[in-house]
Amino acid sequence: MYRPRPMLSPSRFFTPFAVAFVVIITVGLLAMMAGLLIHFLAFDKKAYFYHSSFQILNVEYTEALNSPATHEYRTLSERIEAMITDEFRGSSLKSEFIRTHVVKLRKEGTGVVADVVMKFRSSKRNNRKVMKTRIQSVLRRLSSSGNLEIAPSNEITSLTDQDTENVLTQECGARPDLITLSEERIIGGMQAEPGDWPWQVSLQLNNVHHCGGALISNMWVLTAAHCFKSYPNPQYWTATFGVSTMSPRLRVRVRAILAHDGYSSVTRDNDIAVVQLDRSVAFSRNIHRVCLPAATQNIIPGSVAYVTGWGSLTYGGNAVTNLRQGEVRIISSEECNTPAGYSGSVLPGMLCAGMRSGAVDACQGDSGGPLVQEDSRRLWFVVGIVSWGYQCGLPNKPGVYTRVTAYRNWIRQQTGI
């Protein structure tokens, strides 16, 4: 008799392998959708920069506000930046606001005007006109906050990335994180990248690297006097810019070399010189000046500093062709002058920096190069000039630098800076 074929129950189809396959496909689709969402949220946004000015009604302008090196300039700038930041953090723009920076404090009448750049991150489809209106509405509330009386300007200018770079590279001591108003600070490894130390100069004798230096204006380089002891004629010297001494971004002839009259090759006292360039240097992301400290700036033992240069990696070795950087600590003159150290050879116009264990140090070919420190506003100041030391990287024998604060008036007399 005919018997129909039995129907397979649905449960027979869903074997463990089939269930696993469905789960894998489902998870894969969900992961893909999440990835697309993350990509959209991350890459749909871009940075927007704006410039504005603020009149400070209850602060009188003084000469101390003329330089970012002074305590007064730093304190007032930080107060203004904190007020603006707090206002945006408590507004509807809190998720879009990134950072603000006072570019300059200037005189207007007897009062102070602060020029400020602000950074936001928002959708690429952002309506700039609407964004500008929203920013203005937040800034209008500044007059009633904090203990500064601020009158925000109604003028808010949208800046391109290039505009922002042009504005911020006119300020001394700006590294890449400040030029882009980034929240990240990265200094890693020993190899410097283009733009990391934009004030670094290679002073070359007959087109061969001989000493380092630091650009302190568009016409002047700060360096060590001992670099020119045997070769004082400027016609043999050029200054190059960029991380490579073999293929520099820019090469400029030297017009004049002004070494300190009191330099002693015996005591190494007054080991400082300024070099005048033959032509003005145009500032950019990769080439601009470092800040000079105030004569009263306190260099604190134990604080972090960075030394940069093309010096040899070991005592007696060859110079390198790509710029290197080293993190060191400031060491007190008392510690540096102990019998285990330099036994009193470190004079008041000198500064010690290195590591107690040795290892990281300036070496031959680094002479004249800068020792720099960062302030609370991410501006970098040259506090030392590579001068001398016993060999390189030995315990208790740190590098000895010319103390720039001790020669601040001399630098001003020679250069007008």
Curated annotation (Swiss-Prot):
MF-aspect GO terms: serine-type endopeptidase activity; serine-type peptidase activity
PROSITE patterns (UniProt xref): SEA, TRYPSIN_DOM, TRYPSIN_HIS, TRYPSIN_SER
Domain Peptidase S1: 186-417
Gene3D superfamilies: SEA domain, Trypsin-like serine proteases
Enzyme active site: H226, D271, S367
Disulfide bonds: C172-C291, C211-C227, C336-C352, C363-C392
Keyword Transmembrane helix: yes
All copies of domain SEA, residue ranges: 46-162
SUPFAM superfamilies: SEA domain (SSF82671), Trypsin-like serine proteases (SSF50494)
UniProt topology in membrane: Single-pass type II membrane protein
TM segment ranges: 18-38
Function: May play some biological role in the host defense system on the mucous membrane independently of or in cooperation with other substances in airway mucous or bronchial secretions. Preferentially cleaves the C-terminal side of arginine residues at the P1 position of certain peptides. Plays a role in the proteolytic processing of ACE2. Isoform 2 may play a key role in regulating adrenal proliferation by specifically cleaving N-POMC.
Oligomeric form and interacting partners: Monomer.
Name recorded for this polypeptide: Transmembrane protease serine 11D
